[in-house]
């Protein structure tokens, strides 16, 4: 079986080869918050260490519920760096669907961020679940991203050694019934990105506008490191 670079391989390569180049840019309150590859890498690696310090690790499921934002990408990467499995959710799901996914996936924590109607959606999150809030969109009764990473040293190197390990569970939107989860390993995601990039040449410094929800498998793969 052919080997393809995983998204973590690609992220680490960009982090090392172009640390000072812009990776993510997000409009917040009338201005832009920018993150270079190095800056994002530090946040990702420190949050991974924070997740490990909370007792989360290999194959533990961690959910993300937020509209598109820079910290969505960083949270998803941090989950992988911590050895956990990402469970992204559509940011317009009903509380019942949110609860169903969290229970079905056996999620042990959730990143809760930029949302319309956050109070209503929070009703779908079990009270005993660990909730981490994104900067710029911090909700009440959540653990603060910045506070969590402040006390951590970044994890080192590339933690993904097994490309066949489970990377993420992508659930359907639930519009035609209960959401259904599809399991993707690192190899499958790397294969898809590689084949896509074979058809689009000379992409190096173009600006990519993220429009589709990041919980959509194509958007998630290509925005992160495609």
Language-model features and meaning:
Residues 116-163:
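ANL superfamily adenylate-forming
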Residues 41-46, 182-203, 208-211, 221:
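Conserved structural elements of the adenylate-forming
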Residues 19-22, 152-171, 178, 201-207:
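Conserved pre-ATP/AMP-binding loop-to-beta segment of ANL
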Residues 91-122, 192-209:
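Conserved ATP-dependent adenylate/AMP-binding module captured primarily in the ANL superfamily
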Residues 23-69, 73, 77, 94-99, ...:
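Conserved AMP-binding/adenylate-forming core of the ANL superfamily
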Residues 2-23, 42:
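A short N-terminal helical cap/helix-turn-helix that marks the beginning
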Residues 61, 67-87, 91-95, 103-109, ...:
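A short helix-loop-beta submotif of the ANL/AMP-binding
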Residues 34-38, 167-193:
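Conserved AMP-binding A3 loop
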């Amino acid at each position: 079986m052919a080997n393809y670079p995983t998204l973590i391989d690609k992220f680490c390569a960009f982090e090392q080869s172009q640390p000072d180049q812009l990776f993510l840019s997000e409009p917040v309150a009338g201005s832009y918050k920018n993150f270079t590859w190095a800056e994002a890498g530090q946040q990702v690696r420190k949050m991974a260490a924070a997740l490990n310090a909370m007792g989360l690790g290999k194959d533990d499921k961690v959910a993300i519920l937020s509209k598109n934002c820079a910290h969505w990408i960083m949270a998803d990467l941090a989950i992988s760096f911590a050895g956990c499995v990402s469970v992204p959710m559509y940011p317009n799901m009903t509380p019942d669907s949110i609860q169903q996914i969290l229970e079905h996936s056996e999620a042990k924590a959730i990143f809760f961020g930029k949302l319309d109607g956050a109070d209503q959606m929070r009703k779908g999150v079990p009270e005993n679940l660990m909730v981490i809030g994104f900067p710029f969109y911090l909700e009440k009764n959540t653990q603060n991203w910045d506070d969590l990473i402040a006390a951590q040293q970044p994890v080192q190197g590339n933690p993904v050694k097994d490309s066949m390990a489970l990377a993420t569970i992508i659930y359907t939107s639930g519009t035609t019934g209960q959401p259904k989860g599809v399991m993707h390993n690192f190899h499958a995601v790397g294969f898809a990105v590689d084949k896509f990039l074979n058809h689009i040449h000379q992409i190096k410094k173009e600006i990519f506008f993220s429009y589709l929800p990041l919980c959509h498998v194509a958007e998630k793969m290509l925005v992160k490191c495609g």
